[in-house]
């Protein structure tokens, strides 16, 4: 019996297309949400200049704080975290189980936004928003590690690295294997984005939290 081409079964093509539609939509929505450069937009609207020419050049909340505008930094932190959370929630609304995929896409979007020639932030706040929706206890532990580290050492970058390392450990301890895999990926990307900070920490040249430029 001769097998018929798939093209002769339009119903099968439609079903296959529909199976791909939800994951693809989650990826696109996640990336586009993540790529919104709130820090850059807020500093420009607030008259604080081009964030990319300030401090580390990052578009995240820590660099916004270096402008001396604490309100803008807080708003950036909330919005960057919020877009990560929103990506997960929207993806779960499209199809349950797609949240982690959309969250990862949002994280990549923040770090590599197409609008800024793929030169974005370091993703810590966005990652926290993602984790908050997927597992608030893990998010609470990571935030606590970050806060404790910053209070003790006064380096946001060091706190971010320690928080990124603690998140997958906490998830694994809670038996959340799939979440652990996602958090390992996020942690590796966060370390990669902080490679300049790591070098400055090694040389003793990393600016401390709250230092204005």
Language model features with spans:
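Cytosolic, membrane-interface loops and tails of multi-pass inner-membrane proteins
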Residues: 40-73, 197-213
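C-terminal ends of transmembrane helices
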Residues: 39-44, 109-119, 146-153, 194-199
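Short, non-helical or kinked segments that cap or interrupt transmembrane helices
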Residues: 49-61, 115-128, 155-161
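Interfacial segments of multi-pass membrane proteins
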Residues: 65-68, 91-95, 109, 124-153, ...
């Amino acid at each position: 019996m001769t097998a018929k081409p798939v093209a002769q079964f339009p119903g099968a093509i439609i079903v296959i297309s529909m199976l791909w539609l939800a994951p693809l939509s989650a990826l696109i929505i996640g990336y586009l949400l993540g790529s919104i450069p709130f820090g850059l937009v807020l500093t420009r609207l607030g008259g604080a200049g081009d964030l990319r020419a300030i401090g580390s050049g990052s578009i995240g909340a820590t660099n916004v704080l270096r402008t001396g505008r604490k309100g803008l930094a807080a708003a950036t932190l909330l919005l960057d975290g919020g877009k990560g959370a929103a990506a997960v929630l929207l993806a779960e609304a499209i199809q349950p189980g797609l949240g982690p995929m959309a969250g990862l896409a949002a994280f990549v979007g923040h770090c590599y936004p197409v609008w800024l020639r793929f030169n974005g932030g370091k993703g810590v706040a966005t990652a926290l928003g993602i984790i908050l929706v997927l597992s608030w206890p893990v998010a609470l532990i990571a935030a606590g590690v970050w806060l404790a580290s910053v209070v003790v050492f006064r380096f946001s970058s060091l706190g971010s690295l320690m928080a990124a390392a603690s998140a997958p450990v906490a998830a694994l301890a809670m038996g959340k294997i799939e979440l652990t895999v996602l958090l390992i990926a996020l942690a590796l990307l966060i370390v990669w984005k902080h490679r300049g900070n790591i070098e400055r920490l090694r040389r003793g040249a990393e600016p401390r939290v709250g230092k204005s430029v």
